[in-house]
């Protein structure tokens, strides 16, 4: 039998083996597990970033609010003429009685319908002396001027506002829930404009008599902010900050 007559062998076909269904399911499960882990890490990173942003914003709002209040409240009853002795008669002439304020009185507070303090602070400035009202504006009129600053809370928009000399209220900061004020007085004296002592008790506006309103040495302000992290477990709905401001006019300081 010659070669041409011999039976021809068919080539061996190698069978290509794919993944079984079980292997595919395991691979998909592992991939989903890894993807879930990545998403959790991403969500945690995003939430941490939001928390840090919210806290930073809260700190900025607290700092701005207290800085403005400090600058203005310390000037309550201030007048530009230096004097060694507190000038009772002169101050009464420079700051005449108006509305609820007595002659010479530089600060006054009352509650609004929601229990928030409406704080009025007035002082005198000379043109170009650099003293700022609550809106951050100096006196550039070319003459002496009185600034009446009225702080209040916009309960609808949760904003601390201020109006100057009867003008419109301007929003200063956001996320304010409430503002309370206590007034530091010397309970042992009823002499008007007595700057010989120091505050020994803090009272609400309703507890102050007319004599006390002319003898306020310091003011304790508490601003309660809406907590940006309030939705997280264990976090309070609000956060309160308290500061005490001394009145320069009560200690004979002329800026």
Roles of regions detected by a PLM:
Residues 45, 53-57, 61-64, 74-76, ...:
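Short linear sequence signals and composition-biased patches located at protein termini or domain-edge surfaces
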Residues 2-4, 12, 16-80:
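Aliphatic-rich helix starts adjacent to a transmembrane/signal segment
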Residues 107, 147-156, 181:
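Broad, structure-driven detector of short, well-ordered beta-strand segments within folded domains
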Residues 2, 133-135, 254:
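Sequence contexts marking disulfide-bonded cysteines in secreted/extracellular proteins
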Residues 137-143, 236:
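Short consensus segments that form the blades of beta-propeller domains
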């Amino acid at each position: 039998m010659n070669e041409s007559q011999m039976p021809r062998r068919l080539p061996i076909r190698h069978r290509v083996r794919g993944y079984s269904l079980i292997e595919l399911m395991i691979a998909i499960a592992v991939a989903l597990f890894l993807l879930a882990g990545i998403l959790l890490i991403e969500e945690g990173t995003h939430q941490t970033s939001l928390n840090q942003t919210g806290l930073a914003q809260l700190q900025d709002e607290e700092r701005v609010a207290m800085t403005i209040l400090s600058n203005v409240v310390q000037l309550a009853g201030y007048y530009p003429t230096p004097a060694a002795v507190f000038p009772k008669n002169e101050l009464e002439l420079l700051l005449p009685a108006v509305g609820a304020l007595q002659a010479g009185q530089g600060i006054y507070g009352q509650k609004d319908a929601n229990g928030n303090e409406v704080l009025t602070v007035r002082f005198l400035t000379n043109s170009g002396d650099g003293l700022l009202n609550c809106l951050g504006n100096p006196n550039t009129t070319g003459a002496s001027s009185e600034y009446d600053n009225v702080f209040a809370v916009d309960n609808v928009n949760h904003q601390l506002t201020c109006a100057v000399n009867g003008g419109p209220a301007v929003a200063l900061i956001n996320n304010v829930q409430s503002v309370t004020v206590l007034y530091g007085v010397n309970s042992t004296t009823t002499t008007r404009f007595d700057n010989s002592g120091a505050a020994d008790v803090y009272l609400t506006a309703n507890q102050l008599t007319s004599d006390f309103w002319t003898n306020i040495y310091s003011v304790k302000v508490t601003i309660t902010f809406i907590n940006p992290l309030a939705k997280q477990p264990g976090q309070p709905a609000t956060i309160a900050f308290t500061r005490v401001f001394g009145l320069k006019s009560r200690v004979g300081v002329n800026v």
